[in-house]
A protein has these predicted regions:
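Phosphate/NTP-binding elements of NTP-utilizing enzymes
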Residues: 2-456
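Short, solvent-exposed secondary-structure capping/transition elements
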Residues: 134-139, 464-465, 478
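Nucleic-acid-processing active sites and adjacent nucleic-acid-binding tracks
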Residues: 218, 471-526
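Extended hydrophobic-aromatic, low-complexity segments
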Residues: 263-264, 279-280, 465-466, 477-479
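Gly/Thr-rich phosphate-binding beta-strand-loop-beta motif of the actin/hexokinase/Hsp70
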Residues: 448-474
Length: 526
């Protein structure tokens, strides 16, 4: 086995160890949740070209994280079951076939509006978002409020609030896994059952894309609006004024690059196809839009950001960086299991379902010829999309001489993901030493041995400001021996870190001493 395959085998072992004993707990929540975990274990392998290998490393680690959280935090089973039934209604199994009995909401289908039953992976996603609850330290001094909310209590000198744990969820996979239906349902649920004055936003790279999920939300709302309670236009879905005693919730589409204003008070941000947003001249219109929306969530008790995306035909983009951060967060599950690090609440507020090929499967030829990898990126294979669809699309792309779209959208692999890394972390880690740049001060016979080169990466305040140091130990010229030492320092504004989607990763770097936080609006690197 390669090191990558050994790492995946450890993930399989971790998932199995956490799942054993939790079978009945998962079944009590929903039988499909148990089915999901048992499918993960039954159809996962670390052996190359194993036809039984249907799940990738980061899906497995996401499942392992869910089980740890299930053993750590409170879980609102009734809430999850209510959310599940809201769209699918009641079903009964008849001679091995599930048949719709009553209730639920009709969704668009090839035969018109139909009520669909959630698939096991979708039940896992809904449980990840709606199930977990935790006491959150608001850091407001005890006794400072004349009256506590019914969800609040005073403890250890501050006020704690009982809240939904998940504030950020990422679903990434290929086309045709009903990402639109999933996001549209969440938007509708927030319109009905979340904050009285909920504000939601459907964010996308183009106007047409932004309106796809928005129109699905309107479709679902219109299906249950027998009393004309909602105002549904091309740019707004909202409760009508005469129902303001019930709710003033609203949701609207937003387009990257368009004109948008401050003053929003968002509780929900749906980010559709964020993975296709590129950087242009170091900036991303989509990221700027998302930053504006998410930065308005500060006062909300239970905000939620949901990313639904497949890969894009790009090599650099904001979501690629976010995805790298999510990978790192999930990889820490193995360190948590070993007791090397402790779980972090801010990390646990981010949940994922990452449907990706494994690292050794991202070469173009492998993707285009190996049918097993299709299961890893599309759990709806054989349900709403067929193998023949993949075969036809691959054949057409090869005839046209352009396989980029197929690789990105049907296999969820970025162009950057097909590039072999020159120097990997596995090669660097054994060379690390417990020294910093300040230690490079050796003087030999009155002559300084170390020479240091410094590169500076400046920031306008929306990213890190960093110094990279390369130190060279000059030995006498008649020898080929020498030493090189690399080190770095980085600074981030406190406001930037608090609002960044990479905040859990930044906080880990702060705790390890690699990142320094600067209050105010000025970087202090002295």
């Amino acid at each position: 086995m390669t090191e990558q395959q050994e790492n995946k085998q450890r993930a399989i072992d971790l998932l199995e160890s956490r799942y054993r004993g939790m079978e009945n707990v998962c079944e009590t929540i929903d039988m499909r949740l148990r089915m999901y975990f048992e499918d993960l274990l039954e159809h996962s392998s670390a052996r190359e070209d194993d036809p039984n290998d249907w799940h990738g490393l980061y899906e497995l680690l996401g499942g392992a994280k869910f089980l740890r959280c299930l053993d750590t935090y409170n879980f609102n089973t009734k809430k999850v079951q209510t959310v599940i039934r809201l769209r699918e209604g009641e079903w009964r199994q008849d001679e091995g076939v599930w048949r719709h009995i009553s209730g639920g909401l009709k969704c668009p289908g090839i035969a018109g509006g139909q009520v669909y039953r959630w698939a096991p992976f979708q039940v896992f996603a809904l449980a990840s978002i709606y199930g977990f609850y935790a006491w959150i330290d608001t850091q407001v001094p005890a006794g400072s409020k004349p009256q506590l909310l019914r969800t609040e209590r005073e403890k250890d000198g501050t006020i704690w609030d009982y809240r939904r744990l998940c504030t950020d969820f990422t679903l990434t996979g290929s086309r045709k896994i009903d990402k639109t239906g999933f996001g549209g349902f969440i938007g509708m649920e927030f319109m009905l059952f979340e904050d009285y004055n909920m504000e939601g936003f459907c964010c996308a790279n183009s106007e047409d894309r932004a309106k796809i999920i928005f129109r699905r939300i309107k479709y679902l709302l219109s299906g249950l609006d027998t009393e004309n309670r909602f105002r549904l236009t091309e740019s707004l879905a909202a409760w009508r004024d005469k129902y303001s005693e019930i709710s003033t919730a609203s949701i609207r589409p937003m387009t990257a690059g368009g004109k948008f204003k401050d003053g929003w008070f968002a509780q929900l941000c749906l980010k559709d196809e964020f993975g296709a947003a590129p950087y242009a001249n170091g900036k991303s219109d989509m990221k700027m839009l998302v930053d504006v929306i998410e930065s308005s969530m500060g006062p909300r008790r239970e905000p939620l950001s949901v990313t639904m995306t497949s890969a894009g035909r790009i090599t650099e983009g904001p979501f690629i960086q976010i995805l790298d951060g999510l990978h790192g967060m999930l990889e820490r599950e193995q360190s948590i299991a070993k007791g090397e690090v402790q779980p972090v609440l801010t990390d646990d507020r981010t949940m994922t379902l990452l449907l990706e090929p494994d690292a050794w499967q991202k070469e173009e030829q492998y993707l285009l010829t190996n049918k097993t990898v299709r299961h890893k990126v599309n759990p709806m294979l054989g349900v709403i999309v067929q193998h023949q669809f993949y075969d036809d699309q691959i054949a057409k792309a090869q005839r046209d001489g352009d396989t980029g779209e197929v690789i990105a959208k049907l296999f969820n692999v970025y162009s950057s993901g097909k590039v072999t890394k020159w120097i990997t972390g596995d090669r660097i880690r054994p060379l690390q030493v417990a020294k910093r740049i300040e230690d490079c001060k050796y003087i030999d016979q009155g002559r300084e041995r170390w020479k240091v080169f410094c590169g500076m990466d400046f920031s306008h305040g929306d990213d890190l400001y960093a110094h990279g140091y390369l130190a060279v130990d000059y030995l006498p010229s008649n020898t080929m021996r020498g030493r090189f030492f690399f080190d770095c320092d980085a600074w981030v504004l406190e406001k930037t870190m608090m609002e960044s989607p990479n905040r859990p990763l930044y906080e880990e770097w702060v705790s390890q001493g690699w990142l320094k936080v600067c209050p105010g609006e000025v970087f202090d690197s002295i």
